């Protein structure tokens, strides 16, 4: 039998410090630099999507200076028939998120952080999910905001997660 214990306080404090530091660095980037970097990311995503060829794609509304991929997602939607984009929705705290279909102009609501999401719609599971991150380590492990929403969501979802 395997038992798990809570991470040592040192580890949790280190992660919190790294999260805050990475977020400050990202937010300190000039808007023009972030736009250039988002364009570079979009070109990499173009190549990746040609390889993966998903019919459905989950992405996140930009939050706290994250890459703004909305224009890229709109272009991806128009690049092939039957494509679906989806945004995450926190239905219940400490539970996995659900994804609802997004198209430009769909009625939106704000979550408790002020992040827009589709106000209603059926839940779907995107084939590819663009997951925001603040940093990652040398093994590719993601450092997010610390709420565990994506960890819980990805644990129960069959999708290809791509850190952005």
Model-inferred region functions:
Residues 2-125:
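N-terminal active-site beta-alpha-beta segment that forms phosphate/nucleotide-binding
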Residues 58, 129, 135, 144, ...:
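Conserved beta-strand segments that form the floor/walls of ligand-binding pockets within enzyme
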Residues 86, 130, 160-164:
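Hydrophobic/aromatic beta-strand patches that form the interior of the parallel beta-sheet core
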Residues 104, 134, 158-159:
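Short loop segments at secondary-structure junctions
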Residues 118, 132, 156:
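Mid-sequence acidic-hydrophobic segments that form the walls
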Residues 122-132, 136-140:
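Helix-hairpin-helix/helix-loop-helix acidic hairpins
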Residues 139-164:
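Membrane-associated lipid acylation/remodeling enzymes share a hydrophobic transmembrane-juxtamembrane segment
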